[in-house]
Amino acid sequence: MSGPSESERRTRQQRIDPRLEAAGWRVVPFDLALPMSAYDGCAVTEFPTSNGPADYALCLNRRVVGVVEAKRLTLGPQNVLTQAERYSRGLLGNGLDFDGFHVPFLYATNGEVIWYHDVRHTLNRSRQVAGFHTPAALSEFLGRDLGSACDALALLPNTHPKLRPYQVEANTAVEAAIAERKRQMLVAMATGTGKTFTLVNQVYRLMKSGVAKRVLFLVDRRALAAQAVQAFAAFEAEPGQKFNAIYEVYSQRFHREDLDGENRFDPNVLPESYLVRPQPGDAFVYVSTIQRMTINLFGRDAALGMSDEPFDEDAGQLDIPIHAFDVVIADECHRGYTTAELSTWRNTLDHFDAIKIGLTATPAAHTKAYFRDVVFRYEYERAVREGFLVDYDVVSIKSNVRINGVFLREGEQVGMVDPTSGSEQMDLLEDERQYDAADIERQVTAPDSNRQILEEIRKYAEEHEQRYGRFPKTLIFAVNDLPHTSHADRL
């Protein structure tokens, strides 16, 4: 039976075995009469070591490359990784030795939660993973050395002629965190200071040094994905060579409205095989919306409500292994989500066993909680002080509604919008209502007030255009961007 009284044997049969098989391992019992060559790609149960039998030994190319310690459902697996370490030390004659460990990849699981530890380097820390690595993944890991790649990265000059000093600082901070084996980190840079350029340069350095081969660049909207693809295509990685001439850059399909009419380009759509069957020789960047990746991982129902953009018609659920990407970058990761959306956002990022870098101008609480370490921060005040941003002048636009709120009298005819369906109907107020200034665009909208504010902004923008010959970049911070009652859409 399942639940608190579920035995370890039942947990293994009903939970752990299926998850190993889903990752491509064939679960078989140990047989002393069989040679090691018979166990290639197998999870061998009760595999003998000098410190007792391992629950599962993951075998590749006549060697044990992984050990899985199993516990019943009610026990937390993190604390039993030490048992897997004992088996690793006790598997003498395995042809591998990493400072006394003879098996490099260790797991502990209760069938629901999986903890993993790569013991090849003392700085590596155990971490929770969404599933077991595939045989192909562990084979690839054995052929890669993050320590050597980090050494190569440290020796790689960061001298791109368009880099600003603080952007070099950001790269240095990220690279130091990776060298320390941190897996989640946040880069916070003020709007207008070149976050995307900084990260495109960062991606190139990580790929050139061998720290990363496959990089996922996640954004929130297709238009932002199109801009990111263009940023990679325009980046001159080496003198006379653009990024996409050195490494492949892929994206999802775009709609016409996603593309900047002044900069037309033909995006390369990622072949599905790159996601479901990642190869050690692949080296590419994939730019995707987080909504599409959520569909790819968990199906269309999981992505409901994450965006007001229509679903991509060609998006479907795929069997994507957890090692599909070495680095995942979440751009503009400060966006506010509902509790359900936040859970889906986290699940999507958590699926990948990758270095995760969050990029934002304004770190939200959920962002800092997930990415943990703000490894670099470049704030607006410092950017102004150093001359990279121009300070703003405050212009007061007086609005009685924004100061005093709105008073609606009994019997007034008002439009009522259902925020769920978007349906609108006219109704007569039965009682008078007072809305404070803080309620504007949250509980009640004032179209005339919005119009007057925009007219005032337009006046200053047109003056700027006449003086400098171009319409100024303008950021408008809407109160909300909710389906059917969106202040942003009305503006």
Identify the function of each model-found stretch.
Residues 295-298, 401-407, 486:
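Short, solvent-exposed loop/turn elements at domain surfaces
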Residues 368-472:
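Interdomain helical connector at the RecA1-RecA2 junction of SF1/SF2 helicase-like NTPases
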Residues 75, 224, 292-295, 332-336, ...:
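Residues immediately C-terminal
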Residues 1-214, 219, 223, 227-242, ...:
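ATP-dependent helicase/translocase motor core
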Residues 303-357:
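SF2 helicase catalytic motif II
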